[in-house]
Amino acid sequence: MTGSSSQFQQLEKLGEGTYATVYKGRNRTNGQLVALKEINLDSEEGTPSTAIREISLMKELDHENIVTLYDVIHTENKLTLVFEFMDKDLKKYMEAHGNQGALDLKIVKSFIFQLLKGIMFCHDNRVLHRDLKPQNLLINNKGELKLGDFGLARAFGIPFNTFSNEVVTLWYRAPDVLLGSRAYTASIDIWSAGCIFAEMCTGKPLFPGTSNDDQLIKIFRLMGTPNERTWPGVSSYANFKNNWQIFVPQDLRLLIPNLDSMGLNLLSSLLQMRPDARITARQALQHPWFHEISNPNPLMQHLADPYQQSQQQSQQQAQQSQQMDPQTYR
């Protein structure tokens, strides 16, 4: 990786995280737009482990639904990761194009399909993302969705590695992680995908908890309070309590009335309480709800920005009416 910081021009600040600031930038050589993730290096602590992890994993993950890392520029006091530029994250996309955040179901279908493809590629390469949320899913103006921010991602060598349970933003955190499991599998990413799926349909977070316990209660209210009969071994988790209020599972149709029965079936398969009962990304992509997506290429027409589509349709209609107008032939 041979670039230098002078090769890129900062255009505007896009966001700021725990250890990095992200800018929209331009490659001075070819004019290409990029995202510049700048990490200030502490003279004593050196490069943050999250940055090292992100770089090492993203160099290995080459897929159409994962943001491309073009370059890494290392100077004395700063590390700059040069990524392909994406127009907005899913959260901002929902705010801009949704009906109070809720997206058209054709868009939901294409986005969740692309999300699952990205997840499957990660899992096939033995990588857990561990921080899937709308803010980390990036959309470009072609309607392509890509996984970004692999700062918390981990490679897993065997199915039951022991990891920290302080992963995944609270609202998208799987119940097994909330219950204190430190030995979990790729199924935690699947739960997050289910939460994102529901949020795209309704425009609202499915489980907007304020603390670990509140998050569990919100999940139980909808999915039912687990016990040894419904989830063998659940009582052995560190955060399990015998005095939880007993909730019965609710019908997801009441919460997401605009989603058809096949879509609800897929959502339910993603949001299984027991991690071993959750569908895999590969299985999910074979679900009948996706059968109409015959072409897996994300550049299908319905993946495009709805605003751009309406603009294009208006222009086409104007051109057609102009061609049909007898005045144009006089």
Swiss-Prot record:
Classification via PROSITE patterns: PROTEIN_KINASE_ATP, PROTEIN_KINASE_DOM, PROTEIN_KINASE_ST
Comp. bias (Low complexity): 308-323
GO aspect biological process, one term: filamentous growth
InterPro entries given in the database record: CDK (IPR050108), Kinase-like_dom_sf (IPR011009), Prot_kinase_dom (IPR000719), Protein_kinase_ATP_BS (IPR017441), Ser/Thr_kinase_AS (IPR008271)
GO MF annotation list: ATP binding; cyclin-dependent protein serine/threonine kinase activity; protein serine kinase activity
Enzyme superclass (EC): transferase
Keywords: ATP-binding, Kinase, Nucleotide-binding, Serine/threonine-protein kinase, Transferase
Gene Ontology cellular component annotations, sorted alphabetically: cellular bud neck; cytoplasm; nucleus; Pho85-Pho80 CDK-cyclin complex
Active-site residues, record numbering mapped to chain: 131
Domain spans labelled Protein kinase: 8-290
A Pfam family recorded for this sequence: Pkinase
Chain intervals for the UniProt region annotation (Disordered): 300-330
Catalytic activity: L-seryl-[protein] + ATP = O-phospho-L-seryl-[protein] + ADP + H(+); L-threonyl-[protein] + ATP = O-phospho-L-threonyl-[protein] + ADP + H(+)
Residue numbers binding ATP: 14-22, 37
Gene3D superfamilies registered for this protein in UniProt: Phosphorylase Kinase, domain 1, Transferase(Phosphotransferase) domain 1
Enzyme Commission number(s) of this protein: 2.7.11.22
Role, per record: When phosphate concentrations are high it phosphorylates the PHO4 transcription factor thus establishing repression.
The family this protein is said to belong to: Belongs to the protein kinase superfamily. CMGC Ser/Thr protein kinase family. CDC2/CDKX subfamily.
Record-linked PANTHER family: CELL DIVISION PROTEIN KINASE (PTHR24056), CYCLIN-DEPENDENT KINASE 5 (PTHR24056:SF46)
Subunit note: Interacts with a number of cyclins.
Name of this chain's protein: Negative regulator of the PHO system
Organism: Debaryomyces hansenii (strain ATCC 36239 / CBS 767 / BCRC 21394 / JCM 1990 / NBRC 0083 / IGC 2968)
Organism lineage string: Eukaryota, Fungi, Dikarya, Ascomycota, Saccharomycotina
Gene that encodes the chain: PHO85
